[in-house]
Amino acid sequence: MRIGILGGTFDPIHYGHIRPAIEVKHALALDKILLMPNHIPPHKQQPNLTTAQRLNMVADVCSQLDGFELCDIEAKRDTPSYTVVTLEQLKALHPEDELFFIMGMDSFLQLKSWYEWQRLFNFAHLVVCQRPGWQLDAAHPMQQILTARSHAHQETHEGHAKNTHKNSGQIFPVTITPQDISSTQIREQLAKGEIPADLLMPITLDYIQNQRLYLP
């Protein structure tokens, strides 16, 4: 099975998360996508909502999307959500499956600042999405890693048959439709009493309004 993994604060989850995940799922013929809320994001400030509230919103979204599932492995953890630890645990749970960890180009450019980033490739492939406003310069130090581990490059240089059974360690660049949406933007609109109906799934907006979340 080919399993995509998209982690994030999801504070709240919105179309800027969902639409790229759907595009990646189709582009790479993934069997399912795990949406994985962080508990203690190492690279971000603490979220505005409780972990339980964010889990509820993501679970609601997954109930509406075919092939999407909630993954609460990080939300249950009492220590920082380091990606390499999470992927190691997920690989132990899915030893025969291919894991595809989804990230944006902005995160990929900061990859060397991640805890034990080199070990990520032991457990999963990386899917690098092209987001609005980011373009990797040919001279950027991450370009060498992107080229050396790109799926297309390894297919060309090592042969298709050899890579057919390689279930981790490659990078899959995927061009996605620009989604200029941010959780900060949504929270600000909600705090002003605006209804960002075009940015959120209806089930998410209903939950936010029923729970009276993000009010000033």
Swiss-Prot record:
This is Probable nicotinate-nucleotide adenylyltransferase. It comes from Shewanella baltica (strain OS223). It comes from the Bacteria. GO terms for molecular function: ATP binding; nicotinate-nucleotide adenylyltransferase activity. Pathway: Cofactor biosynthesis; NAD(+) biosynthesis; deamido-NAD(+) from nicotinate D-ribonucleotide: step 1/1. Catalyzes the reversible adenylation of nicotinate mononucleotide (NaMN) to nicotinic acid adenine dinucleotide (NaAD). InterPro entries: Cyt_trans-like, NadD/NMNAT, Rossmann-like_a/b/a_fold. Its EC number is 2.7.7.18. Coiled coil: none annotated. Belongs to the NadD family.
